[in-house]
Amino acid sequence: MLNIFTLANGRLFQEEIESLEELTRFQPIWVDLENPTVEEKRWIKQHYGLSIPEDAMDEDIEESARFYEEDNGDLHIRSDFLIDDNEQPRSVRVAFILNLTNSDLKSKGVLFSIHDEDVPVFRLLRMRARRAPGLIEDAKEVLLALFDGDAEYSADTLENIYDELEKVSKQVLAGDVTDTRAGEVLGAIARQEDLNGRIRRNVMDTRRAVSFMMRSKMLNAEQFEEARQILRDIESLDNHTAFLFGKINFLMDATVGFININQNKIIKIFSVASVALLPPTLIASVYGMNF
């Protein structure tokens, strides 16, 4: 799917592109390719002279190749975005190419984004940019807004983790936890631990991407300050993820402790039963041997 976003009266307007002819009629500041076809990549190559790398969304790409600037001034950034839905929480790799030097693109430049599936942060930005004039002024601000939205989405997800762990705490601290309930609790804790770890990794990734933009000296003073604010927000999120890891470990240890207590009770019952059911002749023999 190929969507382009043009800027008019301070708002972003979205158009779904289905042909090369359609693409040539617009001057977008953002071109978004979701699971692009070979033909859509060819349109980008023909119209913008930009080749989409074959490994654009490769998860195994070296860290040093995720953030770099080409000789022509194009910035390449590969960053992970969180998805927390009813399915398994996961991270989606998004490849960004920020083109600011092509004479055909004028001064606004164009941000190209390539990813395999829709990302909640992208949907949020599209909605806000349609309703709030002046939110976006150029391609660089689109990219900053996406990273800012990623930090906000991570913060919302952390709040959900707090809520879920609060429910787990009430079950664990209520006492008398059966093995069945303990298994359910451990499953819930493991899911929150995985989600918290993904958030911590994603915000670390976002920090690197924003820092790279700041070092590239492509941002004006206002955008630079916006980038610094994103980094401050991420630092705050780091503190929360660290606290949650401690809380998760405590709840997991407490739950495992209840499982051990239940097992000890069972062992004690079997021990008493085994003594009570010993054959009388064996008891008499033991009695005779000792006295």
Predicted regions and their residues:
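Peripheral, non-transmembrane regulatory/ligand-interaction domains of membrane transport proteins
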Residues: 1-221, 229, 233-236, 240
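Long amphipathic alpha-helical coiled-coil segments
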Residues: 209-224, 251-262
